[in-house]
Amino acid sequence: MAERRLVAVLGQVQTYVFQLEMLKRCDPAVVRELAPRVKLNALMCRYLARRLPLEAQTTPLTCALRLALAYARAEGDRVLGALAAAGDDAEAYFERTMGGACRFHARVALDTYGGRVETELQFLHDAENLLKQLNYCHLITPHAVDLSAVDEFLARTIGGGLVVPPELYDPAQPCAVCFEELCVTANQGEATHRRLLGCVCDHLTRQLAVRVDPEDVAKNLPHVHGLDEARRGRALAALAAVDAAEAREAEAASTAAAGAEAGDAGETARRRADALLDAHDVFRPASRRLYAVSELQFWLASTNQAVRALDLFTHNLDDLERRERRAEVRAAAVELALFGRRPEHFDRARAARELDIIDGLLVGGCAASPDERLEALIRACYDHHMSTPMLRMLDPDRANRDALERLLEGGDDADADGGAAGGADAGDGGVGDEDGPGAPPPADAVAWADLPAAALRDAERRRRLYADRLSRRSAASLAQCVREQRRELEKTLRVNVYGDALLHTYVAVAAGFRARRAFCEAAARAGTVVDERETGCFDAHSFMKATVQRHPVDAALLPAVTRKFFELVNGPLFAHDTHAFAQPPNTALYFAVENVGLLPHLKEELARFMVARDWCVSEFRGFYRFQTAGVTATQRQAWRYIRELVLAVAVFRSVFHCGDVEVLRADRFAGRDGLYLTYEASCPLVAVFGAGPGGIGPGTTAVLASDVFGLLHTTLQLRGAPSR
């Protein structure tokens, strides 16, 4: 029930955020009328932020609500402040609500044990890449890492409503979900990283189908509340007058087109052909010439049908522009009838003088959906391709019309030879076919006087065949280009909303660091706390280290300790080994290292890291102490420390047989006894004994240590070696 209420609250907050984004782009005179409602919603956002304990919870739902409330509070104050400062000056209002430096650029600095790392966030994929890198380097990053810059960036982006600004995402950059999808799908022998080059990410942002109805104003105007009935009637009458004027213009254009078509030579030839064919019936023999005219009519009809189907499939850019102008005229008529003036919204104040045709395609309009703009753009590409001289020369419709005119000018139908053979000899091809009506006669039947004309016809025919071959190749290349670029064009031109991939990534990484901090705080409040970080005995360290080093690691234990090493090295983001259908820890680590682009030699080193002879690397009370600089060197040193811990515990269990001593992660604490690795340089190891289902309580003993072998000696004392 609580989750349902949070979902309902999140929906209301996102609705308010969307309204704020609309008001930031509206005429300030319109915003002034709605200012009291904005103030009430701003107060409600403050009340919710104080009432709901969102900071203490790390779920995607609570995180999304917290980010949305933070954005709503900031932008609500911004709108009200801009309205008070700018008055009715639209330019000043827009400058205060949307002006200034780009809010999608953020500098992030992270402190690790290997030094400070600085980067810049510009896109959503930059934030996701940073979180994946932080997940890989979590073992050299303290739990007190400052993620406030990332949190503010996400509040300005994910918290800023549903619609994603086009400048905020790069669809050519794959995310972790893209990589995982490609890993489980058929690859046809192609490497995953090569397939990623052609990937269009649809996870950080998702495409949304948008339906645009040009008649929305006419449908909704009679049902709008708060309008004076006289003004409503004038607005409806203005719409009717605009529709009548458009109908008259369309009828005049249709009449002019029909007149132009009637005067066309091709249409005249077609009417003559229709009259010639209508005069024939089945009781009269069909001559060769009549059959050729009928065949050309067939090809012309099929070609025109294909063109009409293509015209129904898409529109031209000019058609979209006319539709936008029509919608603008209708909106102007309604606004003048209702309000007596046209509000100076942001798109009207800036779009006319600052946006070109490409910007218009990206931004969109009120009369055409993104899919219609995409289809118009593709149609424009095909029209431009078909307008080349070579392809216009090969236009089959034009060639068939020319052949039809030549046949009709050849003479009367009665002087042709017999009919029955005409159909068999005419063939079933078009004009471009070798045996069709336009094919030249055989060479031996040509008179000597006609040799020059026959040679010219033969050369023209060869030139047409060569051009036809080139045109087929160019058309195939264009079709392939459209297929390859269509997905990216769809992603760019369609409306995109925020997906849940980035939010889940941020919550998983932040929850890992928060769980580590909560474990360390709980261990410090245990019923019995033994702090050996500064009081550890050197004799105990030396005894346990010498004992462990005298015994080699059993080769049969190598697979188990390798899996444990991979489990401890992996970050909190990729938890495939904890799913209901758990995979081995090396699978989760594979996704972690591949998503950060780890170099091949480091991946090979990590895979063979457990095969080592000298694995004892820490000094007395010197476990997880880093003296090196640089992320890679510090990461390698952390691997050595974790390898030492895993192998020392494995040998300890096989030598002393004092129960099942497990090495566990602090960010996955589930009330189990064992040795916990906290990844904190100040307190890297915590041994927990007597933990219950509720976690660490008054009856729990927690041993805080910074020495592996001293902690193993304390574990031996607390558990006691069995008598033999």
Curated annotation (Swiss-Prot):
Zinc finger map (C3H1-type): 175-203
The entry's keywords: ATP-binding, Host nucleus, Late protein, Metal-binding, Nucleotide-binding, Viral genome packaging, Viral release from host cell, Zinc, Zinc-finger
A single GO BP: viral DNA genome packaging
Entry GO terms, CC: host cell nucleus
Origin superkingdom: Viruses
Key word Ligase present: no
Family indicated by similarity: Belongs to the herpesviridae TRM1 protein family.
Its biological purpose: Component of the molecular motor that translocates viral genomic DNA in empty capsid during DNA packaging. Forms a tripartite terminase complex together with TRM2 and TRM3 in the host cytoplasm. Once the complex reaches the host nucleus, it interacts with the capsid portal vertex. This portal forms a ring in which genomic DNA is translocated into the capsid. TRM1 carries an endonuclease activity that plays an important role for the cleavage of concatemeric viral DNA into unit length genomes.
Annotated protein name in UniProt: Tripartite terminase subunit 1
Organism: Suid herpesvirus 1 (strain Indiana-Funkhauser / Becker) (SuHV-1)
